C-alpha cells in the first residue's frame, strides 16, 4: 500500500469530520538522524502523526510546531511542519529508557506546546499539561481547552510505521452530539495493525460500513528539513567574530550541524571573513 498519506473524510449524515494519516518513509527519515531508544522512537512517531492531523484540522497556511517538554529522561520531543505536510523532528534524552516506557515515564512532569505561525497573521501558542496517560488523550484535552470541540484521537507507532486518526465535531455544531459519540465508539475499535497494513479506504469501510462517508483526495506527507548553509551562516553572524576567530585558531574550521537531519556545514576563515564583510559588529555586551 502507499505510505505517507493523509486522507480527510466527512460524514454526509453527521456534523462530524475525520482524518487518517499513515506514515512510513518520512517517519524512517526522521528516525535515521539519531539512534533512538524504542520508546522514544514510538513517541516521535505518535507526535509526527499528531502533527500531520493537527496541520490538516487547523487549516492555515504557515508553520506548525508540536513539542512535549518534561523533567523526565526525555527533556524535549518536537515535530516541526507546515501546511504542505512537510515534517521534521527530533528528541533529546539522557540515560537509559525502558522499551515499554509510558508517556509519563518518558517525560515526567511536563507540558505540550502547540505553536502556529501563519504566513499572514499573528502567531498563536497553546499549552496543555501532560496529565493524561497518552499523547492522544493530551491532544484531545488541548482541543477541548482551545477549540471547545469534542475530538477523538488515536495514535500508533512501532518504530517502523506511524499512524493516526482524528474525529471531530464540525465547528459551530452541538457539542453534545450523539452522532459524534456513536462514531467515536466505532473509531475506538481500530487496531494499530489495521492502520499499518490497510489502505485508508479499507480502514474506513471496516469502521463505518453502515455510514455514508465522503473521502477527499489524499495528501502526501514528506520529511523535509529547512536547514541550509545560508541559515547556518546567519546563525554564526549572531556570535562575536572574536569568538569565531578563536575557534578557527584552535580547530581550523567551524562545523555547524543540524540535529534534525544530521547535515553538517563547514566554515573556514575565508568563509567567516565573507560572512562578516560589511556586516554590523555583534554587540558583545550583556
From Swiss-Prot:
Pfam families: HSP33. GO terms for cellular component: cytoplasm. Under oxidizing conditions two disulfide bonds are formed involving the reactive cysteines. Under reducing conditions zinc is bound to the reactive cysteines and the protein is inactive. GO terms for biological process: protein refolding. Transmembrane segments: none annotated. One of its GO terms (molecular function) is unfolded protein binding. Keywords: Chaperone, Cytoplasm, Disulfide bond, Redox-active center, Zinc. It is found in: Cytoplasm. Its main location: cytoplasm. Gene3D superfamilies: helix hairpin bin, Hsp33 domain, HSP33 redox switch-like. InterPro entries: Heat_shock_Hsp33, Heat_shock_Hsp33_C, Heat_shock_Hsp33_N, Hsp33_helix_hairpin_bin_dom_sf. Disulfide bonds join 225-227, 258-261. CDD domains: Hsp33. Belongs to the HSP33 family. PANTHER family: 33 KDA CHAPERONIN. Redox regulated molecular chaperone. Protects both thermally unfolding and oxidatively damaged proteins from irreversible aggregation. Plays an important role in the bacterial defense system toward oxidative stress. This is 33 kDa chaperonin.
Amino acid at each position: 500500500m502507499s505510505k505517507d498519506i493523509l486522507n480527510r473524510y466527512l460524514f454526509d449524515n453527521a456534523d462530524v469530520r475525520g482524518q487518517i494519516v499513515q506514515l512510513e518513509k518520512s517517519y524512517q527519515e526522521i528516525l535515521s538522524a539519531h539512534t533512538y531508544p524504542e520508546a522514544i522512537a514510538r513517541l516521535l512517531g505518535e507526535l509526527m502523526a499528531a502533527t500531520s492531523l493537527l496541520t490538516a484540522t487547523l487549516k492555515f497556511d504557515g508553520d506548525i510546531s508540536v513539542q512535549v517538554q518534561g523533567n523526565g529522561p526525555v527533556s524535549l520531543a518536537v515535530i516541526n511542519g507546515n501546511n504542505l505536510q512537510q515534517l521534521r523532528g527530533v528528541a533529546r534524552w539522557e540515560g537509559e529508557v525502558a522499551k515499554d516506557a509510558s508517556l509519563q515515564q518518558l517525560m515526567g512532569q511536563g507540558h505540550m506546546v502547540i505553536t502556529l505561525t501563519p504566513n499572514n497573521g499573528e502567531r498563536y501558542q497553546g499549552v496543555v499539561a501532560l496529565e493524561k496517560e497518552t499523547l492522544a488523550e493530551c491532544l484531545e484535552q488541548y482541543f477541548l481547552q482551545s477549540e471547545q470541540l469534542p475530538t477523538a484521537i488515536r495514535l500508533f507507532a512501532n518504530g517502523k510505521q506511524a499512524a493516526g486518526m482524528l474525529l471531530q465535531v464540525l465547528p459551530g455544531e452541538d457539542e453534545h452530539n450523539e452522532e459524534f459519540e456513536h462514531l467515536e465508539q466505532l473509531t475506538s475499535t481500530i487496531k494499530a495493525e489495521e492502520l499499518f497494513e490497510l489502505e485508508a479506504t479499507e480502514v474506513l469501510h471496516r469502521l463505518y460500513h453502515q455510514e455514508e462517508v465522503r473521502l477527499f483526495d489524499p495528501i502526501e506527507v514528506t520529511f523535509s528539513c529547512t536547514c541550509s548553509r545560508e541559515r547556518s551562516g546567519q546563525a554564526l553572524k549572531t556570535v562575536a567574530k572574536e569568538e569565531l576567530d578563536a575557534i578557527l585558531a584552535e580547530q581550523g574550521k567551524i562545523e555547524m550541524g543540524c540535529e534534525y537531519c544530521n547535515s553538517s556545514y563547514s566554515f573556514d576563515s575565508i568563509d567567516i571573513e565573507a560572512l562578516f564583510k560589511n556586516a554590523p559588529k555583534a554587540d558583545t555586551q550583556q
